[in-house]
A protein has these predicted regions:
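Class I SAM-dependent transferase core
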Residues: 1-36
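Conserved short-loop catalytic and cofactor-binding motifs
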Residues: 17, 65, 129, 152-155
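Short, conserved micro-motifs enriched in small and acidic residues
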Residues: 20-24, 135, 158
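Residues that form or flank phosphate/diphosphate-binding pockets in enzymes
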Residues: 24, 100, 166
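Charged catalytic carboxylate motif
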Residues: 25, 76, 140
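Conserved SAM/SAH cofactor-binding pocket of Class I
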Residues: 28-103, 108-111, 117-122, 162
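Mobile active-site "lid"/loop adjacent to the S-adenosyl-L-methionine
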Residues: 113-140, 144-147
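Conserved Class I SAM-dependent methyltransferase catalytic core
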Residues: 137-171
Length: 171
C-alpha cells in the first residue's frame, strides 16, 4: 500500500494516505486524552492511528487498541505497528457498533468521530465515511466507549463547538 510517513517528536512513524491522514485536532485530542503509562486504552475511529501512535510516542506502553471501520486506515496502522515493533498496540478493523472485545476493561477511550450529520458529502466514499455520520453516529461512539470503559474510566472526544449541546445530551 502506498503511503507517506509523518514522524512524531520522539521518532514514531505514522503512515498516511490521501484518505487517511490527520490534522491538529487529532494531536490535541491525543495530548488531552493521554493515558498513564500502563493504562489500557482504546482509540476509536482511529483512521491511520495517529492518536494511539502519539500516545506511544509520548511513552504509553499499556495495552492499546486502534479500532477503525475502514480497512485501509486499519492497514496503515497495522503496517506502522509491525514495522516499528509496537507490540502493545493492536489495530482492529471492526465496526464499533458491534465491537465487544474487552468490555469493561479499558481505562481510557478517545475518539475523533465523524463531525457532520448533513450537508454536502465527498464523492469519495472513504472521505464521506470519515467526515459524516453515515455509519457511525455520536450515539454509537458513546455506546461503544461505555461498553469498553471500566468504572471510573474516561472518554475524551474532539468535536465541533456547534454540536456541544448534542454531545452533552448524548453523554
Amino acid at each position: 500500500m502506498e503511503h507517506s510517513t509523518e514522524i512524531l517528536y520522539n521518532k514514531t512513524e505514522v503512515y498516511c494516505s490521501a484518505v487517511h491522514r490527520f490534522g491538529s485536532d487529532a494531536l490535541l485530542l491525543a495530548r488531552f486524552a493521554e493515558p498513564k503509562r500502563l493504562q489500557r486504552a482504546a482509540d476509536l475511529c482511529s483512521g491511520c492511528g495517529i492518536v494511539s501512535l502519539e500516545w506511544h510516542d509520548r511513552g504509553h506502553r499499556g495495552p492499546c487498541i486502534g479500532l477503525e471501520l475502514q480497512p485501509e486506515g486499519s492497514a496503515l496502522l497495522s503496517a506502522a505497528v509491525e514495522e516499528q515493533d509496537i507490540g502493545h498496540l493492536t489495530p482492529v478493523c471492526a465496526d464499533l457498533r458491534t465491537f465487544r472485545q474487552g468490555e469493561g476493561s479499558f481505562d481510557v477511550c478517545a475518539c475523533n468521530p465523524p463531525y457532520f450529520t448533513d450537508g454536502p458529502q465527498s464523492q469519495n466514499a472513504a472521505h464521506a465515511l470519515a467526515r459524516h455520520e453515515n455509519t457511525c453516529t455520536l450515539d454509537d461512539v458513546c455506546r461503544c466507549a461505555f461498553r469498553l470503559l471500566k468504572d471510573g474510566g474516561r472518554l475524551s472526544l474532539c468535536h465541533r463547538p456547534e454540536r456541544l449541546a448534542e454531545v452533552l445530551a448524548v453523554l
